[in-house]
Amino acid sequence: VEEANRAIEEQVEAIMPHVERRVLENGARLFMLDVELFAHRFTFPPPGKTSGEVHDRLVRAYAGEPIVTIGYGPDFAVLRSRGVMMNIPQMVRELRDEIAGAGVSGGGHLVVGSIKFVEGMRDVVLENLIKKIGKAPI
């Protein structure tokens, strides 16, 4: 357990300076982290755990504010939310229908989920996802 906690701490320390920050149309704070470029790969913790740990720290740092964290790689995104009423399965369905050739799949719940897509469509999928999050109720 101690070794795992140390690995998580090292991973989070490595990625935090690279977290991108935005405030969305609905007032939610969006934090994005490229878990392929700025985190250790093929080791513990995996991208979902890394994104979750970063999200939990940001929720503490911005207590009471609506927060969404997206950890992404070349062909996936992991979402965590606090205070933003996202329907991730619905967003996945809409993205799949709206973006031809992106191969969007995935799902989750209202506050946690994951999305897969083809690598060449990453930027298009992420920008459309962010627009949807920006319209979600707080």
Segments (PLM) and residue ranges:
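Glycine-rich, acidic loop segments that terminate in or are immediately followed by a histidine
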Residues: 3-138
